[in-house]
């Protein structure tokens, strides 16, 4: 079964590289295409994937914030939050194009 997955990933990447003259160029990889690329890049060592979970409790019972509270909080912490937020593989390779070297960062 694993051989078929690797063969499928190889065929996919060959098809993508034949369309794109520069196969080493960063590409958008989403969903099954991203998983196939990780299988191909990481090989037998495999890769790790830790999907984000929604751990916030339901907040429907809390009153909504006023416009001033929201504006001040967003303005005060916007830059800091963007700096400390770690980019996941979806943000790095699906929302933006990534290279094979960036994919290797997710191998075990």
Swiss-Prot record:
Heterodimer of a B chain and an A chain linked by two disulfide bonds. Disulfide bonds join 30-94, 42-107, 93-98. PROSITE patterns: INSULIN (PS00262). GO terms for cellular component: extracellular space. This is Insulin. Keywords: Carbohydrate metabolism, Cleavage on pair of basic residues, Disulfide bond, Glucose metabolism, Hormone, Secreted, Signal. Residues 54-85 form a propeptide. GO terms for molecular function: hormone activity. GO terms for biological process: glucose metabolic process. Its main location: secreted. Insulin decreases blood glucose concentration. It increases cell permeability to monosaccharides, amino acids and fatty acids. It accelerates glycolysis, the pentose phosphate cycle, and glycogen synthesis in liver. It comes from Cyprinus carpio (Common carp). The keyword Signal applies. It comes from the Eukaryota. Belongs to the insulin family. The keyword Nucleotide-binding does not apply. Residues 1-21 form the signal peptide. It is found in: Secreted.
């Amino acid at each position: 079964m694993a051989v078929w997955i690797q063969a499928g990933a190889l065929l996919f990447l060959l098809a993508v590289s034949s369309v794109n003259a520069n196969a080493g160029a960063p590409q958008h990889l989403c969903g099954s295409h991203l998983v196939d690329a990780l299988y191909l890049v990481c090989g037998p060592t495999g890769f790790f994937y830790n999907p984000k979970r929604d751990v916030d409790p339901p907040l429907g019972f809390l009153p909504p914030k006023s416009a001033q509270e929201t504006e001040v909080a967003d303005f005060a912490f916007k830059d800091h939050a963007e700096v400390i937020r770690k980019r996941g593989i979806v943000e790095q390779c699906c929302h933006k194009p990534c290279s094979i070297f960036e994919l290797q960062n997710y191998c075990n």
